[in-house]
Each structure stands twice: as C-alpha cells, then as structure tokens.
C-alpha cells in the first residue's frame, strides 16, 4: 500500500503512473450523470480497507506514461471535463498535465483525500477525507464538493466535523460504503424519523 514510486522517472510531472484512462459517465457526487474523461493514477498511501480501487495502490505496477499521450487521448473524445483520480493523485506534480489539458479548454476535476499538498489547476475539487490520514487545511478551502464515505454511525459525526471546515458553497455528500449501505441507510432513515 505505502509503496513509493521513482520520482526521477516522472520527469517533473511530464510522466505519471497511469493505471487507466477512459471516457465515461460520472456515477458519484455532484456531477453524476455527466460525461467525463477519467485519468486514474497509480499510488496511494491512505489505504482504505473498503477501497474499490486497491489495484491502484502500488505505483510501481504502472510504468510512467508521457502526459502528451494522455492528453492526446483525452482530447480525441467529446469530453469537456477531465476527472483526475486514483489512488491519490496529489502524490504527484500535476501542473504539467493540468496545464496541457487546460490549453485545450477542458474543465479539470480532481478527486482527492486532500492529504498531500495541491499542485495543478482545477475547476472542481471533490474532497473525500479519510480518518487514517486527514486532509491538509488547504484541502478544505479548495473543496467544491465534500464526499464522506459512511461505514458506521461514528462516520456521521466525522462528516459533520469535516463539513464545518469547508466553505459555505461547498456541496456536501454522504456516500454509503457499499458493503454496508443498507444498514447505513436504515440508520440514517431512523435518525431522520426521530428528528421529526
């Protein structure tokens, strides 16, 4: 999980450990249902046990890919928005990639735990904070969307504490951890009924 990549091979962000890139429809959060081109990078030092992309954790499994190739593929489809995700994409210098994509007039979205310093240019930041490696303060003021994964009741309080730190315009989402989603939804529904 906590594998480091060889930063010398990344050429200052002109190469990145690309897991996959593809055109799709967004399935979570504020932009659900909108088309986007996803760029998924390898490497994650957060290691959520319920992660649906554990295959991305070890960046050494993904040879550094020249960003010009990624930009070429992203601009060859109809996408107007690019989602950079992982793993944890902020492990890498994203300035060269985001600058190249912005040069084509594309909107750049970032999905991050916020636990590393920001690099790059983003039109939308989806912050998904994790208890085991909390976000840096700058992540809260950069966030346009806060998405907290809820696995148990205590996560609702964690979500509230994080929501208090983001800006007033930030969109707030609770995302049930899928293996316990029915239990979480029943818990939330029961609590809401008690408040009426």
What are these regions (language model features)?
Residues 188-196:
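Single conserved hydrophobic/aromatic residue that forms the stacking wall/gate
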Residues 2, 25, 46-49:
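Basic, often amphipathic N-terminal segments
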Residues 12, 16-20, 35-36, 42, ...:
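Conserved Radical SAM active-site core
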Residues 80-108, 112-165, 170-183:
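Conserved glycine-rich "GG(E/T)P / GGGxP" loop and the immediately following alpha-helix
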Residues 44, 89, 150, 192-193:
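Hydrophobic pocket-lining residues within nucleotide cofactor-binding pockets
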Residues 5-8:
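Polytopic alpha-helical membrane-helix bundles and their juxtamembrane interface segments
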Residues 31-33, 140:
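A generic structural micro-feature
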Residues 27-29:
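A short beta-strand-turn-helix
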């Amino acid at each position: 999980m906590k594998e480091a990549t060889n930063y010398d091979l990344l050429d200052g962000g002109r190469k990145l450990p690309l897991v996959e890139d593809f055109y799709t429809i967004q399935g979570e959060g504020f932009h659900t249902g909108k088309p986007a081109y996803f760029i998924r990078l390898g490497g994650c030092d957060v290691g959520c046990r319920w992660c649906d992309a554990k295959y991305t954790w070890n960046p050494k499994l993904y040879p550094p890919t020249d960003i010009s190739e990624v930009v070429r593929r992203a601009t060859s489809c109809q996408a107007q928005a690019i989602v950079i995700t992982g793993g944890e994409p902020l492990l890498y210098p994203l300035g060269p990639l985001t600058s190249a994509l912005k040069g084509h007039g594309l909107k750049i979205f970032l999905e991050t735990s916020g636990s590393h310093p920001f690099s790059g240019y983003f039109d939308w930041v989806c912050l998904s904070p994790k208890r085991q490696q909390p976000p840096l303060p700058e992540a809260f003021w950069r966030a346009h969307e806060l998405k907290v994964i809820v696995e148990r009741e205590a996560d609702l309080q964690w979500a509230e504490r994080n929501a208090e730190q983001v800006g007033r315009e930030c969109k707030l989402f609770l995302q049930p951890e899928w293996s316990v989603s029915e239990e979480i939804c029943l818990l939330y529904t029961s609590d809401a009924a008690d408040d009426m």
